[in-house]
Design a protein with these regions (language model features):
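Glycine-rich flexible loops
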Residues: 1-204
């Protein structure tokens, strides 16, 4: 596994830049909410728990974990977040950083980049009585899934494993925001922009 500061490709730096941009948008991320990840081989770098995406470039807040070890741990349907931490080859930083509780969710989504935001426009619509019907109108031509609310973390990971299809790269989480997946940062940016345009048209 890649350790510490050894992984500093241009792509990784652009990932940090995009994470910071997301963190600056208060309609997408509030305080320490939201998380992003990038995969390189079996290593996934993910935002550490309790840290702010707005600080993605100014401080060390990404933690490397083994994707295969997380997936192996999830085979035990009774596993907990702490048990996953014990089972993975985690490099604990001098500051004691721990990966986001959403790390399992990121690991089971087979895309290079995962961006999870607490988008207020998505959440405002998701709590409405007929929201799923509305989302079907808005995103009819996208590869997306609506995920009924479950507790963030392990429970959400299992729900995604149950409902997702191979091609799904957009997930609407009831009362919990949005997940956008892609193989490039440009794809991530385009999806976010496209989703925003669709939501604005719907509300207007």
């Amino acid at each position: 596994m890649i350790k510490g500061n050894d992984f500093r490709s241009k792509e990784y730096e652009l990932f940090l830049e995009r994470s910071e941009e997301i963190g600056l948008d208060r309609t997408m991320v509030q305080a320490a909410g939201g998380n992003t990840s990038i995969k390189e081989g079996d290593t996934m770098w993910i935002k550490s728990s309790g840290k702010w995406l707005i600080d993605a470039r100014s401080s060390e807040l990404m933690v490397p974990v083994s994707i295969s070890q997380i997936k192996d741990a999830l085979k035990d349907s009774s596993c907990s977040y702490d048990e996953i931490l014990k089972s993975i080859d985690l490099k604990i930083s001098p500051d004691g950083l721990r990966p986001s509780v959403e790390a399992p969710m990121h690991a089971i989504l087979d895309f290079k980049f995962i961006f999870h935001t607490h988008d207020i426009f998505i959440n405002a619509l998701a709590v409405q009585k007929y929201s799923q019907i509305d989302f079907e109108k808005i995103f009819s031509d996208l590869n997306w899934k609506f995920i009924p609310y479950v507790k963030p973390g392990i429970e959400l990971s299992y729900k995604l494993m149950q409902l997702k299809s191979f091609e799904d790269n957009v997930f609407i989480l009831e009362n919990h925001g949005l997940i956008v997946c892609g193989e490039s940062l440009e794809e991530i940016r385009h999806l976010y922009q496209d989703i925003r345009v669709r939501l604005k048209k719907f509300h207007n």
